[in-house]
UniProtKB/Swiss-Prot annotation:
This is Peptide chain release factor 1. Belongs to the prokaryotic/mitochondrial release factor family. Residues 288-309 are annotated as: Disordered. The modification N5-methylglutamine is found at residue 233.
Amino acid sequence: MSILAEKLSSILKRYDELTALLSSAEVISDIKKLTELSKEQSSIEEISIASKEYLSVLEDIKENKELLEDKELSELAKEELKILETKKSDLETAIKQLLIPKDPNDDKNIYLELRAGTGGDEAGIFVGDLFKAYCRYADLKKWKVEIVSSSENSVGGYKEIIALIKGKGVYSRLKFEAGTHRVQRVPETESQGRIHTSAITVAIMPEVDDVEVSINPSDLKIEVFRAGGHGGQCVNTTDSAVRITHLPTNISVSMQDEKSQHKNKDKALKILKARLYEKQIEEQQLANAKDRKEQVGSGDRSERIRTYNYPQNRLSEHRINLTLYSLEEIMLSGNLDEVINPLIAHAQSQFE
């Protein structure tokens, strides 16, 4: 048996063990254990299906090779072997991709944060446009989007939007969106038809629990104040808005979308934990960068990753030199897979 076949056999064995464990009374009565084992089984389900098929093809190849000695069946066996060898090769390619080490955060939900950068009102308008594209993409993927916090500007755009996106494989696909997105287009208010360039930043932060990020309460500075509306007018007569600052890192989160101070504090704390976890990921990636090829998806907010040129209907993905002349269609349909799939393929190729 080859090394690959042995590896796949052990994966199948573990999958069968998990199936048995998940139907045992002991595990069913332990929610934590049940969730843990279910996640493990789910993580190897795809590779298990491919493994079963691959091992079956190997068995068929072995049988047909034996039939080559039979004069009556040798020609039929030769034809069958051609088909089987092609199938074996295709399965090996797919299995190698499935065996690439998984990012431990790939199955997590995310906090998506979009912030207007240079370019004034135009940047704020593009925050709204790109957020709509992400929402359409989420619809295509059957993900759930919940706006956690938003700050509008005076022309119908946004200074900032933070949303929680839940669903299968959210982080695995959207992690490549982190960075600076540049937009080039003629603003509606531009009478001379001049193209303006503006930029926004996108952050992708995995949703984390208390076990993954533990915060010492003494490291937090919590301030409460009255929520303000547009132009600074007061929209709440009580001190319901909350600002939490993590003193060791000086990372700060403000929240005023809810009328309840308790709810604002809870939301702010969750986002703070996500930002601290994002910082951990960035530091780990920097430490690992010296030991491996540079990978797409560093998550650095300052890295200019993409340009959206509306006059040319062009989307340029700078990290992999990808150019698509279907910008408007992608933005309106939300079919970001046209950009994300090549990014994933490039990231996977770094392991080969």
